[in-house]
Amino acid sequence: MAVSASLVKELRERTGLGMMECKKALVETDGDIDVAIENLRKASGLKAAKKADRTAAEGVVAVKVAEDGSYGVMVEVNSETDFVARDAGFLAFVDTVVNKAFDTKATDVAALAGDEIESTRQALVQKIGENIGVRRVQLIEAGSGVVGAYLHSNNRIAVLTQLTAGDVELARDIAMHVAAVNPQVVNSADMPAEVVEKEKEIIKAQPDMEGKPAEIVDKMMVGRINKFLKENSLVDQPFVKNPEVTVGKLAKDAGAEVVGFVRFEVGEGIEKVEEDFAAEVAAQVAASKA
């Protein structure tokens, strides 16, 4: 049957899908828009499944902290391309995810990704045409202290910090420092032994160590390991907004100590497959024939 342009327009407005996809759905249902929507919803699950094997290494992070600093949550939601990561619909989905995490104090993705979140995700995959996934979620509760957060302007780096005391603004300043400098641990004593041992091996292999007496090598080793620990321990680092004081001193002057921090950066740890243009076109042609 012939489908009117107004009906196609209505379906597009209600689903956000493309004109040809909407027209096809209406033709298949003889113009029944409700059945067309139902069929499209069913199809979205299949479409989402087909895209699930594609690497989603772009995206954004989001963070939300209680006004009193009693707790905060942070999430990472991935897309395949940076272009989609700036899409209004994608960003609205991220807001839904972080608000759900905040309201429920979610501690893992499985607990967060209920029917509502999953159905919204699948509908977005259907509309945008990319694999989209909620990768991780982090909850930090302040206890008797305070939690602060920082989200970088590009939405690709976010940090939650926990202090024993102080206020949300101090915790936020320290979170901003963590975002900028990326320390490995809070205190040097927290550095994993295997990391220290690996650094020692690197130092021993440096040319200026060759041929020196053992006692000299040992002294140089101690000095360089201490330097490495200071450079990578949050409380020993010069505060990014005032290098005259360390982060530890900044917190101490406010009657606080840094308990911990968590830093999310979009795509860290994900191996992104790089394809050349010819390979990408070939893959798309093969997919269209499947």
Curated annotation (Swiss-Prot):
- Which keywords does this Swiss-Prot/TrEMBL entry list? Cytoplasm, Elongation factor, Protein biosynthesis
- GO cellular component terms, semicolon-separated: cytoplasm
- Entry-linked PROSITE patterns: EF_TS_1 (PS01126), EF_TS_2 (PS01127)
Record flagged with keyword Cytoplasm: yes
Compartments (UniProt record): Cytoplasm
- Alphabetized GO MF terms: translation elongation factor activity
Sequence segments annotated as region (Involved in Mg(2+) ion dislocation from EF-Tu): 81-84
Fetch the Gene3D superfamilies from UniProt: 1.10.286.20, DNA helicase RuvA subunit, C-terminal domain, Elongation factor Ts, dimerisation domain
The record's Pfam families line, in alphabetical order, gives: EF_TS
Give the top-rank taxon of the lineage listed in the UniProt record for this protein. Answer: Bacteria
Task: Work out whether the entry's keyword set contains Cytoplasm.
Answer: yes
The record, for HAMAP family, names: EF_Ts (MF_00050)
Q: Which PANTHER family match?
A: ELONGATION FACTOR TS (PTHR11741), ELONGATION FACTOR TS, MITOCHONDRIAL (PTHR11741:SF0)
Relate the protein's function as given in its record: Associates with the EF-Tu.GDP complex and induces the exchange of GDP to GTP. It remains bound to the aminoacyl-tRNA.EF-Tu.GTP complex up to the GTP hydrolysis stage on the ribosome.
The text of the family note is: Belongs to the EF-Ts family.
Question: What is this protein called in UniProt?
Answer: Elongation factor Ts
The organism is Saccharophagus degradans (strain 2-40 / ATCC 43961 / DSM 17024)
As recorded in Swiss-Prot or TrEMBL, the protein's gene is named tsf
